[in-house]
A protein has these predicted regions:
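Donor-nucleotide binding loops and adjacent catalytic segments primarily
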Residues: 56, 61, 65, 187-270, ...
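Acidic donor-binding loop of glycosyltransferase active sites
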Residues: 108-110, 265-280, 287-288
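Glycosyltransferases and closely related glycan-assembly transferases
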Residues: 98-111, 119-134, 147-151
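Nucleotide-sugar donor-binding and catalytic loop/hinge architecture
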Residues: 6, 11-16, 181-198, 205, ...
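Active-site-proximal region of nucleotide-activated glycan assembly enzymes
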Residues: 49, 57, 68, 127-187
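A short, well-ordered alpha-helix in the C-terminal region of glycosyltransferases
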Residues: 341-355
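Conserved nucleotide-sugar phosphate-binding/catalytic loop shared by glycosyltransferases and other
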Residues: 18-23, 45-91, 96, 234-236, ...
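C-terminal alpha-helical cap of glycosyltransferases
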Residues: 354-373
């Protein structure tokens, strides 16, 4: 069993060194950044080390956020052929060996897994060497890495109570952490030109991009009353930018936006997928949204996320199979043409927000460390 050394604790028994492992997409990474900020808030001299892969979004964003990053080999076991699985298995074993070296060098108080296959090597090494560890699970159905390792962690911090059965008495419902900037976004005064923020997560969404492109002819009479801010993902940025230009719309189109909270703050309406982190950010920001759940998410959990928002009268949902340019345009016109309805969605979204999730998770991390002393 790992025995905590005095130098991993702050003067008030706060965590001085922590590893945050995983990423791949913003949905995994951004909650981890929120937790890192909370650790720093409690201990201003705390050292945070992120561990991920070179292929994930963390390779670009973690250094931009001012944190150290170490990359390990790892690979997904889902959605790939047997040859790729064999290669990824070898990479993951190498990653576990590398993770053990990192643990020996950094000697953290705790290892926090944020999900994704990138978390697997570091969490596995923490389990094998007895370091305190916990996992964060954002979705109603856990990812493969969390399902495989969940029985050997100290705690599983959950967003959705329905996930409880996967982790038994290690499960604690904390909510999904949101970066601090989203919580301080003020209410918006709605007046033309209305800003519509469109994105499909950190990697974009082809069906949303297509529907927005096809919606433009149906929004032609609103051309002077709309401004689009559209995060397309890497593969469609030029195509979508050209569509706006050809239709004569004012649009800022990029593959990826840094400082995304600024786009939320300026938005009158959001069109997005319904990943757990996106939904948590929409709630925290208090913004009205049209949610288009990704239809191939495990056990259709994005539909469950969106439906919970609809049940709270906090968002509009359009099923991916029913998403057309004409329907999207009609929904945009309906909401932006009724400011009272827009403001009601915003109020209800903010009411549904859990704003202290990262505090609850760091409390769990401290509890995990204390259990190993």
């Amino acid at each position: 069993m790992f025995l905590c050394n005095l130098d991993v604790w702050g003067p008030d028994l706060g965590i001085m060194r922590a590893i945050i492992a995983g990423g791949g997409t913003g949905g995994h990474l951004f909650p981890g950044i929120a937790v890192a900020r909370e650790i720093q808030r409690r201990e201003k001299n705390a050292e945070i080390l992120f561990v991920g892969t070179e292929q994930g979004i963390e390779a670009r964003l973690v250094p931009q956020e001012g944190f150290r990053l170490r990359c390990l080999p790892a690979g997904s076991m889902k959605g790939v052929g047997w040859g790729a699985r064999a290669r990824n298995l070898v990479a993951t074993v190498k990653g576990i060996l590398g993770a053990r070296r990192i643990l020996g060098e950094f000697r953290p108080a705790v290892v926090i897994g944020v999900g994704g296959y990138a978390s697997f090597p570091m969490l596995s090494a923490a389990i094998l060497t007895g370091y305190p560890r916990l996992i964060m699970e954002q979705n109603a159905v856990p990812g493969l890495a969390n399902r495989m390792l969940g029985r050997w962690v100290d705690f599983a911090a959950l967003t959705d109570p329905r996930t409880h059965s996967y982790f038994g008495d290690r499960a604690v419902v904390t909510g999904n952490p949101v970066r601090p900037q989203f919580k301080s976004i003020p209410a918006k005064t709605h007046q033309p030109p209305f800003q519509v923020l469109v994105f499909g997560g950190s990697q974009g969404a082809r069906s949303i991009n297509k529907a927005v492109r096809e919606s433009l002819p149906f929004l032609s009479e609103w051309k002077d009353r709309l401004r689009f801010v559209h995060q397309t993902g890497e593969n469609q940025v030029h195509e979508i930018r050209s569509a706006y230009e050809d239709a004569g719309f004012n649009a800022d189109v990029r593959a990826f936006f840094n400082g995304f909270h600024e786009q939320y703050a300026a938005a009158d309406l959001i069109v997005a997928r319904a990943g757990a982190t996106t939904v948590a950010e929409i709630k925290a920001a208090g913004r009205a949204a049209i949610l288009v759940p990704f239809p191939f998410a495990a056990d259709d959990h994005q539909t469950q996320n969106a439906r919970s928002m609809v049940d709270d009268d906090a968002a509009i949902m359009i099923a991916n199979a029913k998403l057309t340019g004409e329907r999207l345009a009609a929904t945009i016109r309906s909401l932006l043409g009724d400011v009272a309805r827009l403001e009601a969605l915003e109020r209800n979204a903010r009411k549904a927000a859990v704003l202290d999730a990262e505090q609850r998770i760091v409390d769990l991390a401290e509890k995990a460390v204390q259990a190993h002393v």
